[in-house]
Design a protein with these regions (language model features):
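Active-site beta->alpha loop and helix N-cap motifs at the rims of alpha/beta catalytic domains
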Residues: 1-104
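Catalytic alpha/beta core domains of metabolic enzymes, predominantly
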Residues: 87, 99-170
């Protein structure tokens, strides 16, 4: 159990940087549950600032979407997450939501990044297809035992568990 701060329903895109940093601090003062901060944005410097704020407040991890304005090729996605993986100083997750970003972080890329970055702890796969998430579970298991695959839709919670995934982040 834990809390995801500033997910899609949290309307993070409508908040200023200062508001997002303030929320990161305020949420920590309100609960001792594990916290994950969505640090997605269109500027790497802002994303790094948000991640640093979350880590300094003791957040369990941060989560990031692919760039959500310009759809990216698989090669561009890999370069993007390589850059983020080098900047994030703590645990992090990828938030895969192709309906909102126009691109899909597929199982092969997830496995490649999981092998490359020990602090890359998991993925929230918000895809309306249980077999997509199952493919990520299988690919990640080939390279890491400690990698977490979470579905993003409640109705896939049980199928995700049955396929070896770790639950839902909703």
């Amino acid at each position: 159990d834990g809390v995801l701060l500033m997910g899609s329903i949290g309307e993070f895109t409508a908040l200023s940087m200062d508001e997002r940093v303030s929320l990161i601090h305020a949420a920590r003062t309100m609960t001792h549950l594990p916290l994950i901060a969505n640090v997605s944005g269109t500027c790497m410097e802002d994303m790094t600032r948000l991640a640093d704020a979350a880590y300094s407040e003791g957040y369990e991890a941060v989560m990031a979407l692919p760039h959500y304005y310009f759809a990216q090729t698989p090669r561009q996605l890999e370069a993007y997450f390589d850059t983020l993986g080098g900047r994030f100083e703590g645990e992090w997750l990828i938030y895969n939501f192709p309906a909102r970003t126009g691109c899909d972080v597929d199982a092969a890329l997830i496995a490649k990044l999981a092998a490359r970055f020990p602090r890359f702890m998991g993925v929230k796969d918000t895809v309306d297809c249980a077999s997509h998430t199952r493919a990520i579970v299988r690919a990640a298991a080939e390279v890491r035992e400690d990698f977490s695959v979470l579905c993003g839709f409640d109705e896939y919670f049980i199928p995700n568990l049955m396929n070896g995934g770790d639950g839902v982040l909703s």
